[in-house]
């Protein structure tokens, strides 16, 4: 389960109290809690002050017993901010890390090298919509298959964005795509 607040802006870090309650509830169901680490909506280019806030949020959530984090950071050129990400990954060590949909802002031509970096630096999974909100479903499905190949069993690809009960099986039919993400996906 990914836990976040403010879905209207793409998700932000939930409060300490919400994280604590979710971790307690999840234990009853043997469910994992992955907490969004994002100090605000908008772009994914963070100041040093925002990175400090993100590090403090990771520390607090870790102390509450979460299983991992969903996070991301980009440069103003929409490339991975590897310096910021290394800092966040170090703070997240030994827990699962999902690169969230900030990835979708990276130009398609640069995505293979970004995936390589994520694999080399211990990221667990990549959450992506495999296109824009306007991208046709067939094109997204094709792109997911390409991303699964690029991940080469070293990074889980997590399909997200517009997935619902009505279409989830089309995504899960892609070889190597075993997870879907959404607010309207119920099994």
Language-model features: where?
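Conserved, mostly hydrophobic/aromatic
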Residues: 22, 61, 88, 100, ...
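Catalytic cores of alpha/beta
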Residues: 42-60, 97, 104-121, 142-159, ...
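Active-site-adjacent beta->alpha loops and helix N-cap segments on the catalytic face
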Residues: 7-34, 48-52, 73-93, 106-113, ...
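Beta-hairpin (beta-strand-turn-beta-strand) motif
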Residues: 38-40, 74, 102
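Short glycine/serine/threonine/alanine-rich loop segments
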Residues: 31, 66, 95, 123, ...
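Glycine-rich nucleotide/cofactor/substrate-binding loop typically near the N-terminus or early
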Residues: 32-33, 37-44
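Structural beta-sheet core signal
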Residues: 35-37, 71, 99, 159
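Glycine-rich phosphate-binding active-site loops on the catalytic face of alpha/beta enzymes
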Residues: 1-11, 60-78, 121-136, 163-164, ...
């Amino acid at each position: 389960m990914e836990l976040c607040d403010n879905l209207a802006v793409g998700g932000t870090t939930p409060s300490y109290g919400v994280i604590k309650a979710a971790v307690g509830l999840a234990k009853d169901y043997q469910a994992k809690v992955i907490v969004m680490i994002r100090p605000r909506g908008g772009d994914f280019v963070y100041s040093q002050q925002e990175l400090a806030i993100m590090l403090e949020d990771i520390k607090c959530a870790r102390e509450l017993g979460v299983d991992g984090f969903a996070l991301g950071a980009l440069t103003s050129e929409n490339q991975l901010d590897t310096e910021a990400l290394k800092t966040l990954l170090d703070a997240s060590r030994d827990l699962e890390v999902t690169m969230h949909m900030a990835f979708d802002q990276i130009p398609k031509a640069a995505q293979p090298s970004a995936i390589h970096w994520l694999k080399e630096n211990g990221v667990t999974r990549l959450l992506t919509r495999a296109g824009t909100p306007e991208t046709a479903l067939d094109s997204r499905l094709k792109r997911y298959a390409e991303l699964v190949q690029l991940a080469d069993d070293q990074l889980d690809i997590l399909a997200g964005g517009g997935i619902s009960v009505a279409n989830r099986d089309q995504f899960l039919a892609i070889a190597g795509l075993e997870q879907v993400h959404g607010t309207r996906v119920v099994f």
